[in-house]
Regions:
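Methionine residue identity
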Residues: 1-3, 13
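Flavin-dependent oxidoreductase catalytic cores
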Residues: 10, 15-332
């Protein structure tokens, strides 16, 4: 089956309302609540379904952001990704990228029509193609403009709860106290804080003290994000910040799909389980897309467990079948 074209539909599609979907379970007693961060081109509905069924451990799966346009149309893959059928039985959190409060408000009504009760605003994407247009973490450059945007957005009652994902500044972490003060003044369902600046992208040191400040500022339900790769990383965070309720994990989950389960005291993934994981993903992607696309996605995903291992990375580059990819990643 060929890949569906990413043509934009002439207007937002509607789905039958199904109440009670997608509300992040922040009031649960098991700490921390674990959010699975999105990775465009990998964590689609097939990925989420297979991960949920084989490993679990993620309380909420965050969807790749919808880049909102003036026409309020969505790509075919975006419509499919947010559909209730694609996310049956899972808590998911739709996310939007925009600098226009009217666009966001209209999109939130669409999210409500899909049956979801919470959605997320992306103020964290550091990609230059996004930030140069004043979207994503580009909105952090001008605190006055950010406040004006949020004032207009919250001037009316929203149809669903709204959360936000942010960075701690654009140029410097010294910007964070002012940004935190702004965010604390609005009724967000939760605030996910990636403890790096836009300039730092995804490399270099992190600033966990920024999360501590968020707790002091009483930002609504702060969620920690940034370099949580192992159970030790999560345990160290909780020891440093006992009041932390929730974490968001991205690259750590890609390298170790059982990480959420292990954080809760479960077992690490064995080789048979990993083999089943990669095989199920490949078969699912192959059914939806072309075989070459499916293999490309598998190889992109496997870059994370192969990170730092020169031999595995060399084998993965040469692999041209799912069997040779699995051999490269898990050694069999």
């Amino acid at each position: 089956m060929g890949m569906e074209p990413n043509a934009r539909k002439p207007g937002i599609m509607r789905y039958e309302r199904q109440k009670g979907r997608g509300m992040p379970p922040l009031k649960q007693t098991t700490k921390p609540v674990i959010y699975f961060a999105p990775m465009e081109g990998i964590t689609d509905g097939i990925f989420r379904r297979v991960h949920h069924e084989l490993f679990g451990g993620a309380d909420v799966y965050c969807l790749p952001f919808h880049k909102l346009t003036q026409s309020m149309s969505l790509l075919t893959r975006e419509i499919r990704d947010i559909s209730p059928e694609e996310n049956e039985g899972m808590n998911v959190l739709p996310q939007a990228l925009t600098r226009d409060p009217e666009q966001l408000s209209a999109w939130l009504y669409y999210v409500s029509e899909c049956g979801y009760s919470c959605a997320d605003l992306n103020l964290g994407c550091p990609s230059p193609t996004v930030t140069r247009r004043g979207r994503g973490s580009g909105m952090l450059r001008d605190p006055d403009e950010l406040r004006f945007f949020l004032d207009r957005l919250f001037a009316n009652t929203l149809p669903v709860s709204l959360s936000v994902k942010t960075r701690i500044g654009y140029e410097s972490a010294e910007e964070w106290p002012g940004i935190a003060e702004i965010l604390a003044g609005y009724p967000f369902a939760h605030v996910t804080i990636h403890v790096r600046t836009t300039r730092e992208q995804y490399t270099g040191g992190i600033h966990p003290e920024a999360f501590e400040l968020a707790l002091q500022k009483r930002i609504p339900h702060p969620v920690y994000n940034g370099d949580l790769r192992t159970t030790e990383d999560v345990n160290n965070l909780l020891a440093r910040c006992p009041a932390a309720e929730a974490v968001m994990i991205g690259r750590g989950f890609l390298a170790d799909p059982a990480l959420g389960r292990r954080i809760r005291g479960g077992e690490a993934a064995g080789k048979d389980e990993l083999r089943a994981w990669y095989t199920a993903l490949y078969e699912g992607w192959k059914d939806r897309f072309q075989g070459t696309i499916a293999l490309g996605r598998i190889k992109k995903l496997m870059e994370w467990p192969c990170e730092g291992d020169i031999k595995k990375k060399r084998l993965l580059r040469r692999a041209d079948t799912i069997e040779s990819c699995i051999h490269a990643a898990i050694g069999e």
